[in-house]
Each structure stands twice: as structure tokens, then as C-alpha cells.
């Protein structure tokens, strides 16, 4: 931004697959209910996060970890939908909303700001979120994959690696403890498929499943 308007510099913005997100453990109530998880994700205004946290220099991900430039990425629209979020919470048995604690740290400079913006957005859907700062030195050992809701970050990976390493039921770093047989099957089918169109369809079906049931909100 400091070079904008300066004729001495030619500024180019190149999309990458690096991302930050908020993880809900799918094995822990109330996030063990997919309707609750989707309600939380629907309550988030992703474009506002991109604008406020990244100064507009980011791409809305709609909860897929696949990079914007990846040939297997599924492009989706995911506008904030407070009405639907409230409806899903009611169907899940939480007509008055839920309470949650978002654990952040300065391990990643953007996490505290993401937490604060998400906190304000969730309130519109009746979700009361507390943002709790945790020690940076012990974040990966004592907070990540331990607390019900915590922040995460990943660098760009090929579609197959990103989907397997973060979401496959048997993956070591399945940080949201996500388990979905159809998702795993799509990944397996994609790896064994020689036809590009069919392989792409399998990877994109996996991403559709993440949009419906994922425990990870990727702005």
C-alpha cells in the first residue's frame, strides 16, 4: 500500500495459496453438529475480513484450502447469510445461539485482528464469541489441535496435499478432527483417476463437502 500512487514503482499483486483460518474441532460440542459449524461459517463476512485484515490484497476462499491458481480449485460464492445461520442454529437445538472462545496469539500477526472481526460478525447471528489471547511460544503444542476453537495457518500446497494433509480422516494434521467417508472416498478416487475431467470432479466434490460440513473457516 505504501507504494500505491508512486510513479517510481510498478506494484503487482500475485495470488498465492497461503491462508489463515479458524478451526472448530468437529469432535467437540457444539461443533460436532455440522449445522452449527456451517452456521458459524455462514455468519462470517469474508470480504470484510479480506478488506480489514489484508487491505483487500487477498482472495475469498469459501473454506477451500486449494490455491486460487490451482487447476482443481472449486470456485464458489459464499456471502454472509445471517438469516440462514440463525435457522441452522435453531435446527441444531440452539435457538438462542451459542457461546464460544476463539483462541488466538501473536504467533501469526493477523490472528488477533481476524478474531476480533469474526467476533463482531458472529454476534449478528446470536453467537457470542470471546477472543482469548494465548502464549505464542506454546501455541502449537498447547492450543492448536487442543482447544475447541483456535486459529491456524498453512502455506500453499497442491490440491491433493492440501486436502489430504488437513482433512483426511487418517491424516496426522487433521486439525479439525474432520471425518467424512464420502470426502475420503473422493480423494481416493481422484488419486486413482487417469482422466483429468473425472479427477477434477472428484477433487471438487471433496471441496463441496468441505463447504457443507467443514470445521475450518477459511475466509
Model-based region annotation:
Residues 8, 95-102, 119-134, 198:
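A local structural motif
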Residues 13-24, 69, 171, 175-184:
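Periplasmic-binding protein-like
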Residues 114, 119-168:
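Periplasmic binding protein-like
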Residues 2-6, 17-61, 86-88, 98-111, ...:
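Alpha-helical secondary-structure segments
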Residues 59-91, 108-113:
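Structural transition elements
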Residues 39, 43, 52, 88, ...:
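Generic, well-ordered alpha-helical scaffold segments in large soluble proteins
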Residues 35-38, 50, 124, 129-139, ...:
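Extracytoplasmic/peripheral linker and loop segments enriched in polar/acidic and small residues
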Amino acid at each position: 500500500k505504501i507504494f500505491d500512487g508512486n510513479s517510481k514503482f510498478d506494484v503487482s499483486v500475485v495470488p498465492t495459496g497461503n491462508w489463515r483460518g479458524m478451526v472448530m474441532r468437529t469432535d467437540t460440542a457444539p461443533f460436532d453438529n455440522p449445522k452449527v459449524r456451517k452456521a458459524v461459517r455462514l455468519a462470517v463476512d469474508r470480504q470484510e475480513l479480506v478488506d480489514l485484515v489484508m487491505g483487500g490484497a487477498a482472495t475469498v476462499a469459501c473454506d477451500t484450502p486449494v490455491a486460487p491458481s490451482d487447476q482443481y480449485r472449486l470456485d464458489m460464492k459464499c456471502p454472509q447469510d445471517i438469516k440462514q445461520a440463525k435457522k441452522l442454529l435453531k435446527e441444531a437445538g440452539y435457538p438462542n445461539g451459542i457461546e464460544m472462545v476463539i483462541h488466538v496469539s501473536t504467533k501469526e500477526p493477523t490472528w488477533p485482528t481476524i478474531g476480533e472481526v469474526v467476533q463482531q460478525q458472529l454476534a449478528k447471528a446470536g453467537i457470542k464469541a470471546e477472543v482469548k489471547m494465548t502464549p505464542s511460544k506454546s501455541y502449537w503444542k498447547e492450543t492448536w489441535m487442543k482447544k475447541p476453537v483456535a486459529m491456524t495457518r498453512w502455506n500453499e500446497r497442491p490440491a491433493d496435499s492440501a486436502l489430504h494433509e488437513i482433512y483426511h480422516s487418517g491424516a496426522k494434521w487433521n486439525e479439525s478432527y474432520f471425518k467424512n467417508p464420502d470426502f475420503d472416498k473422493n480423494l481416493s478416487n481422484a488419486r486413482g483417476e487417469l482422466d483429468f475431467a473425472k479427477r477434477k470432479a472428484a477433487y471438487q466434490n471433496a471441496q463441496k463437502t468441505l463447504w457443507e460440513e467443514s470445521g475450518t473457516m477459511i475466509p
